[in-house]
Amino acid sequence: PMTKVLKADDINKAISAFKDPGTFDYKRFFHLVGLKGKTDAQVKEVFEILDKDQSGFIEEEELKGVLKGFSAHGRDLNDTETKALLAAGDSDHDGKIGADEFAKMVAQA
């Protein structure tokens, strides 16, 4: 579970901050949830949890549920938020976010 890598308090704070549709900001979320400053291995571990189908990529459908990946209380992102998140992370434009792309997003947050 995510709490193996991140503090439950931080996760809850971050989920609460973006409970309203249309408010999601991945950079702020990564800071609030405590992902910034984690080791490469820990960031990879978070990526693997979010990669529900273990394909090596976080696809659009998985991005939509990214907050649920952190907490059962998370909401689905709306289409605009999902597409913005994908656009921000998908540097090779293949329609999904790989582990390296995810690590880069965290580093740039």
Swiss-Prot record:
Residues 38-73, 77-109 form the EF-hand domain. InterPro entries: EF-hand-dom_pair, EF_Hand_1_Ca_BS, EF_hand_dom, Parvalbumin. It holds the Pfam family EF-hand_7. Transmembrane segments: none annotated. SUPFAM superfamilies: EF-hand. One of its GO terms (cellular component) is cytoplasm. Ca(2+) 2 binds at residues 90, 92, 94, 96, 101. One of its GO terms (molecular function) is calcium ion binding. Keywords: Calcium, Metal-binding, Muscle protein, Repeat. Ca(2+) 1 binds at residues 51, 53, 55, 62. In muscle, parvalbumin is thought to be involved in relaxation after contraction. It binds two calcium ions. Belongs to the parvalbumin family. This is Parvalbumin alpha.
